[in-house]
């Protein structure tokens, strides 16, 4: 485990540095320590990109007044050396307790950022707790890899403790600010002032912009400052932990007291007290502090918790009273709340008395500290130190994070991070943190710091957990339902449309604040109306029967309401840290809801009774997963066959992988069944991937991990590489690690429905003659081998007749056969008009294509720039190879060539069904890459050929006959022609869409009029800098007026992009009229509409969380000048889903001359073909954007090429970052030529004109360069042809860092595949009676 200050050195602001300055400085390389080093801290920066040669930083120097601060040109001639703090290491140092002895001490090592002199083998270090920098040999510096290395040193050194705590606080706060986490909304901050008269000014965060990572603030000292970027200006969070500024009260000593319980293996509890007596005339407010970690996880701790009058070990409560309170709690209204950050503190239950306890008053004033605030002198309580409490004699001895268990006789539950049994670091369970005394700089106290090292981590401060140990005048912690103060309000960020069970990585958290209006209102939640039957415990007769019989029943409410004294799931423990009562009472958040079984013991106490098993489903649960034609909407027979033919093999692979995992589980472990919950997306707590079926769950807290994360963890443990995993695992209730062997295998699909559906798929494909190339051993109607489901009995509820018939499949209990190696498909017996092509040697085709690829490229590199006059030639008919080979050989217009070939081979045996697939591949090779003659290269106009592909489908070909362009967006046959190219992974363009749109809705004036006052994130396309303090109106004012654009520091008009606007909300909710206008006129509605029959996302039942597929707007100025050709409006990237991007408006700005000539040169430089140029010159169409799209199969070649270029330029390639997913590259003409020459990768150069819709396949890398100012709208969809790319990309995105927007799996590809197949076979089975008539 290496403890790193940050994930990377991407941000300098707030970091400490060591530098060497002087233009003519001369140094002795042998005396590095005697060089005139200067140290300090970076307060501001001019650019985010550290590699920008013009970057300047604003610094303060140590041992100098802050007024002597200055700007430094980082890569200028004055800066000879510049080192910044990097990570924590160990090095030899004199022992603090015995200077004559040398020990391994922790130190911060500095990394060279600018080095014009060589340090050789010398490293710069700063030992924690010391100010001086030292220079040691790198051989003496060791990384912190062992948890035990700091244990003894931490116990003995108070100075180190304080410095280490400060390091943790600083890193966590920086991470929260730089990531613009929503849990910092309403928090007070100190912002560094550039005004020479003051160093800091204070403010409050009113909102965050997660896309640009900017903060919206309110500052009374500087009202004009509304938006700041913490990556450019130093910002410090101000924590309100209690009364720390009241100088009239002196700190008193504190006392640690241990008490033993009646249980022999009770963990020793150490309690820390703070004796300050708060004023009685101040109203107390309970607040909840949240910390955002570098890995995106959220920690929640309690500030000023409520006190209790109950004795610490007063566990016993009459059963009748307990049941009465449970019934009262269950009567609350249910609602679906917003997701919150996960609490990593172990949480034991509290007695009802504790929940109703009074609340002591708060501290008088919050602290104010920042990077430059001197350290306080508050006292600290170190392990082993015993102090005397000089307080009120009547006060109780309490531990703030100790909570009594409500279960009768359960005296071992200590809660809140206190280990239930002695552990490796049990002696340090009360390790102090930032002192709560008035003079202390920090107010937070931490639990055992070594518990932080028990969690797998690769980056500091991942794995570090925080809790509060002591506050002024606080008694035992009471976690209550909600703050009872009448004036107190809760600021709740806007809810998502559905609940996502991923609390650790959710940006939302709740923090009690002073009475004020929330920064933005909460939108209604679609699942607010979801209701569940009342708990069985509310029925007196049923409750009595259950108590007498001891029968098990399913938990039908949240843990807090049903079983507060039993193990609580992670969500219910978080519920007690700040949700309103209505939110807490919602059972939908509980991970044990309809999952865990309970029963009453002989004493009438509620106990755990295990979990549901796969055979315990009911009709409602199983119907969601079975192919029932009555539940299928908007799916016809032909479409069902097409979908099954395209994704049936992927479904089989999905089932085979599930079977493989199931067969590898421990036979002695019972598989649990977790039923799907409406409006909840089950996600892996480690990698954020949506969980489809099999996963592993902790029976104590509900922590769940996917199959891949489980395997990775087991592999790392078995190989002894613990701590090196890509994904860290959260800890269990009381700080214990989650061990793989303690997790239980769990499935979501009930019973054997998954394997039954797989049987039906093979049966249906055989009956309907649908081609299949899956590797299943039961490919030809053989029953699938189903894993054994233990305790297989009849379901308790009767099944409907359709279910019984569908599930009436033989159950063969065998291990799945290994995947069969498919043999080469035999040649069909009959011959078709082009049957000779089936034996055409594809290797020759590929070789010929490759040879001519370079030949055609070399010829096109030196094409002269055509003039306007050169395009005045007469228009003649365009005859392309694509049109001739795809024209049917007969006069029958009913279908094109592939339909003809399919019809000729349909009567053959099953072995003959591979012919169309072979022809598809050959057509793809021939159409994409055949040698181009001079005739093909010559532009011959843009004719409309009504019968070109067997349909009345007007179209033509671009990109040297490699790009299909459909000319009539309303043609009903478009989708038949479209899918022939689409299935080959080619992009497609549809022109003329703007003729159907309401142009008034898409004009810049309409947007300026409706939304001009909204604040927005503007991006400088030339520098990628974020422009703060701007409005939507500022952007639209310069859309078609260059002099009216915002200017940079040098007075030059900026090329801006309006990023992620409208933000957050559904496009339909924000711009309903535009949404309807687009959806009513978007081409190929079978694919692009939300309910399109070929949009597989529409197959996902409303029971599930639907993926957000748009529409999304992309608005940006044009990059016109020759220097702008190296910049991209949108850099090279790829998307997990297919997309249709429509150019709805092109604005030609005023104020510049010869724009047409510059645009023409840019189009020519972008490798556009002559037909494209003809559209611009002769037909006077408005070009909007230049696209470069590459085939998905070439992604890895492009990735390796960009990594090689990055290494050549001296850039790093971190393992959790990706040159394509990072969107950090734009391939200009030089790079595109290198890519073609070195890797043979050629893309499609497409100019998108007004009204053009560009269809981009999933997984296809693409980039965009705006020629003029553009308004584009994109709609995503999931097509059957590209599901395989969606699935592969989901796996890729797992390995991205948590800061990537694509890291989270929002598409749910496995769920989409399953339900699309399920609906398809339901339609096919319902129409089996018509088979004889075909």
UniProtKB/Swiss-Prot annotation:
Residues 243-288, 352-382, 514-533 are annotated as: Disordered. Fe cation binds at residues 1133, 1135, 1262. It comes from the Eukaryota. It is an enzyme of class 1 (oxidoreductase). InterPro entries: DUF7030 (IPR054294), JHDM2-like (IPR045109), JmjC_dom (IPR003347), KDM3AB_Tudor (IPR054503), PWWP_KDM3B (IPR054504). A zinc finger (C6-type) spans 684-709. The JmjC domain and the C6-type zinc-finger are required for the demethylation activity. This is Lysine-specific demethylase 3A-B. The gene is kdm3a-b.
